UniProtKB/Swiss-Prot annotation:
Stated family: Belongs to the peptidase S14 family.
Pfam families with a match to the protein in the record: CLP_protease
Keyword hit for Transcription: no
Name listed for the protein in its UniProt record: ATP-dependent Clp protease proteolytic subunit 1
Gene Ontology molecular functions: ATP-dependent peptidase activity; ATPase binding; serine-type endopeptidase activity
Gene name per UniProt: clpP1
Annotated PROSITE patterns: CLP_PROTEASE_HIS, CLP_PROTEASE_SER
Main localization (coarse): cytoplasm
Organism: Bifidobacterium longum (strain NCC 2705)
Broad enzyme group: hydrolase
Subcellular location(s) of the protein: Cytoplasm
Amino acid sequence: MASEEAKFAARADRLAGRQGVAGFMPASARAAQPAPTNRYIMPQFVEKTPYGMKTQDAYSRLFEDRIIFLGVQVDDASADDVMAQLLVLESQDPNRDVMMYINSPGGSMTAMTAIYDTMQYIKPDVQTVCLGQAASAAAILLASGTKGKRLMLPNARVLIHQPAIDQGFGKATEIEIQAKEMLRMREWLEETLAKHTGQDVEKIRRDIEVDTFLTAPEAKEYGIVDEVLEHRQ
């Protein structure tokens, strides 16, 4: 009997490994799993095309309309996704605008600069639209859209602040290297925001010394966006 139970347990563990079903996992494995979230499950829908029926999700449908949705933290993975989409859309039609919707808490400075450089590199104009929030690194991406094509919804907000060091420990020489790199990144951020907003570098320097939150009208006045829209035009 014990051997049968052992066989069943082993089979259940193998099945859990294949399916990733928490209920099939041993207690030790379940304890190691992240807590469940209430994330909304993105539905898929079926659309009729000249080539037959096609099933896709909302993000794929938006991409067909040349819309990129940045709705997560800015990190290496999301940066790669955004850059790949920008390059594909340029190759499909270099003369049509790309639209980037942003609702992001920010994230990695290096990942953000990779997206920024790609936005400046490609030929199509990049329209940026802030829904919800564009914080930290995401605020730079919002401001770096094509001038005159940077939009924001009325209840969205922007946060700008200075970059921070991921690690503040190590050998003295390593800390010195990190500090120099942080100062270099801060100088780049100040100059880039000044370039895209028209603000004086000294004002940018003062404003990012602490967390500075901007409402949609304030972001427009600051020069981060060009228009605040309540309805699609």
